[in-house]
A protein has these predicted regions:
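Acidic-glycine-rich active-site phosphate/pyrophosphate-binding loop
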Residues: 1-13, 45-47, 84-106, 382-396, ...
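Non-catalytic terminal/interface segments that mediate subunit docking, oligomerization
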Residues: 312-439, 443-454, 530-539, 547, ...
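Thiamine diphosphate
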Residues: 93-105, 129, 133-137, 142-147, ...
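Cofactor-binding active-site loop characterized by glycine-rich and histidine/acidic residues
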Residues: 33-174, 388-389, 421
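Terminal amphipathic helices with adjacent charged low-complexity linkers/tails
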Residues: 55-56, 240-252, 256-336
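A glycine-rich helix N-cap at a beta->alpha junction
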Residues: 80-90, 171-184, 207-211, 448-467, ...
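Glycine/charged-rich beta-loop-alpha catalytic/anionic-binding loops adjacent to active sites
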Residues: 14-22, 49-58, 99-114, 145-151, ...
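Active-site nucleophile and cofactor-binding loops and adjacent substrate-binding regions
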Residues: 22-34, 60-66, 102-123, 155-158, ...
Length: 662
């Protein structure tokens, strides 16, 4: 067994031992794809194991995140993040750096949190799009300071997921030639052979997408894998699919090629049989010959030279183009937005009724002028979402410098690509669609929140205010779903001022996603709205009494309704406070003193008004309060008719407040 074979087998052995010790995990993928990972990292990756944060590194995304021991074994052997053998031994244990699925921000070297199959594929597309855009912004003749590949590895499961078709269809259209996809084709799924549910010709499918396609017959043939990678890199106009025919659970006589190799430990006897079958020289658990460690150390040292070479190039670049250094720093360290966010223009009150989606579009373009690295788009709804960036160009195969991304009707891919754009670094991204279609993006938004990425989601057409399109297009439960997502901040603004606050928060927030939930219909500009919207909830119209008779809480389009109801109640001698609550998440983060000043415990008579699900409101109104909300689906008809039919009227709010007061 030569040193390369031993180095490949070290990945297999460490993976099998770690999974066996944890008595939990997925050995099939690491055993089958170890040669792909070794060949790629040792000979083709532009990567410095000693600095996994280097901005011009090649990215490798393991879309089949269940095979995480493939990554952890590589990280340990190459010294990436100084991942110790003890951490490998603690695989899947609470508090370890080796969780069951790779987690971005938790384990150094992990480029993306993966596990939900297919999402890693689309995040890789986002990274490749980021590389293409940044290269068009920064590169000068002879100075390719942004010049790297994005590799992604996934199996049959990833290829079955619809998101893979969405993202690769777009990647082919965009001609992302620095995207290289490894297809781990082992023809096995959890339930058995893929023949039971997946018989399509994946290669032909990718040809239709516009990919170069290459096939490696033997997944253990390092030379063939290396040749395929070089062939993929040689194509400068198309992304590439490398189909590698592998054997799941390779090397374990009782398990290889079987579904049982996928998601359970091999068993003590089978681990021993694996080591004997592949000729492993060590008998003990987690034992790797020193010569293998030495080989990986030498590889790591050689790989580090790539960054040294790039540093020299970059130093020469900034010397010749000093103006680009400031631009680079702004892109990668962030723009100072204080001038815009402290300007009178930004906080100017609107002088007429306007849909918050329209207001958002205006503010978005103000932000773009102050933050040129803003990039984003919609799932074929930009004219409705009002997300077009004026004079910023369209991102296309012929113009990677464009900032307007056209995702097509591909909401799932859009959200995951947004994650990839943010993971890459150097850009501030947003994505957009109708709020009712946020159901398509929810799994991807969950990963946005889990990775704490500051991606902005623009959701328009936020309620029964959609009107004539009817219940298929009228969100009900979506707002509650996003409010329940840990780390996701939702804003449902009532007017221009609150929309400005929402965008300011979205831009300045560096930890977690923000969702802007915006109206289709015009809303009045509220006299009492203010920057206090940044606190999540505030008094927008107060009572004259020190202790109000009741409190009405509302968000978005229902805030003006609440204020109008307050004016009617005064005629009957009832003096209420109106609280605008654009963001429950931010309000909940305020001090106890502030929350008491807005919603005093002494005032138990409370009514919340929101034209969506009532889920989540009772923690503010309590057992003595009431919620005016949607209790079922909407209907088709003029918006005004629907609001009246479903009880979102001044009369009903007045009636409900009186009932609560008793």
């Amino acid at each position: 067994m030569n040193i390369e074979e031993m180095s490949v087998n070290a990945i297999r052995v460490l993976s099998a031992d770690a999974i066996q010790k944890a008595n939990s995990g997925h050995p099939g993928l690491p055993l089958g794809t170890a040669p792909i990972a070794y060949e790629l990292f040792s000979k083709h990756m532009n990567y410095n194991p000693q600095n996994p944060e280097w901005i011009n590194r090649d990215r490798f995304v393991l879309s089949g995140g269940h095979g995480s021991m493939l990554l952890y074994s590589l990280f340990h052997l190459f010294g990436i993040g100084n991942l110790s053998l003890d951490e490998v031994k603690n695989f899947r244990q609470f508090g370890s750096l080796t969780p069951g699925h790779p987690e971005y921000g938790h384990t150094v070297g992990v480029e993306a949190t993966t596990g939900p199959l297919g999402q890693g594929m689309a995040m890789a597309v986002g990274m490749a799009m980021a590389e293409a855009h940044l290269a068009s912004v920064f590169n000068k003749e002879g100075y390719p300071v942004v010049d790297h590949y994005t590799y992604v590895l996934g199996g049959d499961g990833c290829m079955m997921e619809g998101i893979s078709s969405e993202c690769f269809s777009l990647a082919g259209t965009l001609g992302l030639s620095k995207l290289i996809v490894f297809y781990d084709s082992n023809n096995i799924s959890i339930e058995g052979s893929t023949d039971i549910a997946f018989t399509e010709d994946v290669v032909t499918r990718f040809k239709a997408f516009g990919f170069q396609t290459i096939e490696v017959e033997d997944g253990n043939d390092l030379c063939a894998i290396g040749k395929a990678i070089e062939e993929a890199k040689a194509d400068k106009t198309r992304p590439s699919l490398i189909k590698v025919n592998t054997l799941i659970g390779y090397g374990c006589p009782a398990k290889q090629g079987k579904a049982s190799a996928h998601g359970e430990p091999l068993g003590v006897d089978n681990v021993a049989a694996l080591k004997e079958n592949i000729g492993w020289p060590c008998k003990g658990d987690f034992e790797v010959p020193q010569e293998v460690y030495d080989h990986y150390k030498e590889l790591s040292a050689n790989m580090a030279k790539a960054e040294d070479k790039w540093n020299e190039l970059f130093a020469s670049y900034v010397e010749k183009y000093p103006e680009m250094k400031e631009l680079w720093d702004n892109y990668f360290d962030g723009y100072d937005m204080s001038d815009l966010f402290n300007s009178d223009e930004y906080w100017a009150k609107g002088d007429k009724a306007e849909a918050t989606r329209n207001t958002s579009g205006t503010i978005l373009n103000m932000i773009k002028k102050a933050m040129p690295n803003l990039i984003g788009g919609s799932a074929d709804l930009a004219p409705s979402n009002k997300t077009n960036l004026k004079d910023a160009g369209d991102f296309s195969k012929d113009n990677y410098a464009g900032s307007n991304l056209h995702f097509g009707v591909r909401e799932q891919a859009m959200a995951a690509i947004g994650n990839g754009l943010m993971l890459h670094g150097g850009l501030k991204a947003f994505v957009a669609t109708f709020f009712v279609f946020s159901d398509y993006v929810k799994p991807m938004a969950r990963l946005t929140a889990l990775m704490q990425l500051p991606l902005t989601y623009v959701f328009t057409h936020d309620s029964i205010g959609v009107g004539e399109d009817g219940p298929t297009h009228e969100p009900i439960e979506q707002l509650a779903a996003f409010r329940s997502l840990p780390g996701f901040t939702v804003f449902r603004p009532c007017d221009r001022t609150e929309t400005a606050a929402a965008w300011m928060y979205a831009v300045e927030n560096e930890c977690g996603p923000t969702g802007l939930v915006l109206t289709r219909q015009n809303l009045p500009q509220m006299e009492g709205s203010s920057k206090d919207a940044l606190k999540g909830g505030y008094v927008i119209a107060d009572s004259q009494k020190e202790v109000p008779d009741a409190i009405i809480i509302a968000s978005g389009s229902e805030v003006s309704l609440a204020v109008n109801a307050k004016e009617e109640l005064i005629k009957d001698g009832i003096d209420v406070r109106v609280v605008s609550m654009p963001s429950m998440e931010l309000f909940d983060k305020q001090s106890a003193e502030y929350k008491e000043s807005v919603l005093p415990n002494a005032v138990r008579k409370r009514v919340a008004v929101e034209a969506l699900s009532d889920f989540g409101w009772y923690k503010y109104v309590g057992l003595d309060g009431r919620v005016i909300a949607m209790e079922g689906f909407g209907a088709s008809g003029p918006a005004a008719t629907l609001f009246e039919h479903f009880g979102f009227t001044v009369d009903n709010v007045v009636k409900t407040v009186k009932e609560v007061i008793g």
